[in-house]
Amino acid sequence: MEIAMSSQREIRLNAFDMNCVGHQSPGLWAHPRDRSWQYKDLEYWVDLARLLERGKFDGLFIADVLGIYDVLNGSGDAAIRQATQVPVNDPLALITPMALVTEHLGFGLTASLSFEHPYPFARRLSTLDHLTKGRVGWNIVTSYLESGARNIGQQTQTDHDTRYDYADEYLQVIYKLLEGSWEDGAVLRDRERKIFSDPRKIHPINHQGQFFSVPGIHLCEPSPQRTPVLYQAGASSRGKQFAAGHAECVFVAAPSKVLLKKTVADIRRRAVEAGGDPHSILIFNLQTVIVGDTDREAQAKWQEYKQYVSYEGALALLSGWTGIDFGQYQPDQVLKYLHTNAIQSAVEAFSTADPNRQWTVQALADWAGIGGFGPLVVGSAQTVADELQSWVEETDVDGFNLAYAVTHETFRDVVELLVPELQKRGVFKQEYREGTLREKLFGAGPRLAAPHPGASYRRDARTAASVEEKVT
């Protein structure tokens, strides 16, 4: 049953996690109540999925990297010591068992198109969409870690713009396989005539491009969504252009309302230029919330959590994300006096969050130590709800990807304290919509709709010969 929302804007929530220890909060795995070290146990993920569905989360957004953060001091040692997203397991295997214990929760799978050919990957997507009954999304990334490129035989990472040229063609192949290879009605399951599928309605895609040659048919029958919900997280100009053309949901990590408002407006403008509706794309900002029964209790939790942050682990993350070796600087060095383009770009972004702060290397590590680059909100459910509503109203963002400090504690506090407050205000759903993830998010049909480019690859079944003309 769907409950009517108030006239205020609905807030969307995803949980943000990764098949590793600590994810965005380096060092917090050592906290006595943290369970992230249990990432390799199915019970960890099953418990999380049940908790998130109880809290009516839209989905679980699962990050991934294929590589190690080895920029800090030119080595991966710090990342290894501090479990900074290593060890890390494959995210795909998590989805099916979590889908089995839930009915509505969506699953956003991060998978890099840099390291797997689209033909077998299309089969993985269809398989997951079948097994989840249409509750899967794909976060499209072009990998950025040099260590990942080297370990698959590339001497260096492909240059940025070429990666997006590659991505555009990769998506063409995916659309042709998932949308165009099998017509609606191709699967008959006709026991009397012993005909499972009509070959007249299944077509080779005959793709020949700059990067890929794929002549054959898709190996899977159409899944509930055909193409999973498409997420994208590119922050560059080219990445945002790619998102405007392909993504249905965009994940950003803006540390301030000023920067987020600019980013959201830019993405929506690009969506219009690509021929779409500016609000047809859902935009989620990275956010971490620490919620307590009172503001004082929440602040006490935050102070407790900060004692476990690993400075070395935070620098390993920051160095990997930015390409800057922060190990060459002292903790008290002021960033604005370090004259590199990459550092000045980082300073400019964080200065919008707190223009009066003296941004030293230590201050940047402290910021990123709980929840990564996104903003942190600490307080009672009422305080946090006020703040999240202000972000939505002032920036035009649709919702948040919530990172954790301590898991599952952070998410449990959101479910038990924050969600009821948001529901009371009429800005968060009381119940899920029925249907696939796409239907739950957008309230329309299960498949890509025009003018999305993927929809243009779908064949009109009415133009094809019927099975009666082919099979007797």
Predicted regions and their residues:
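N-terminal glycine-rich cofactor-binding segment that shapes the pocket for flavin-like pterin cofactors
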Residues: 1-472
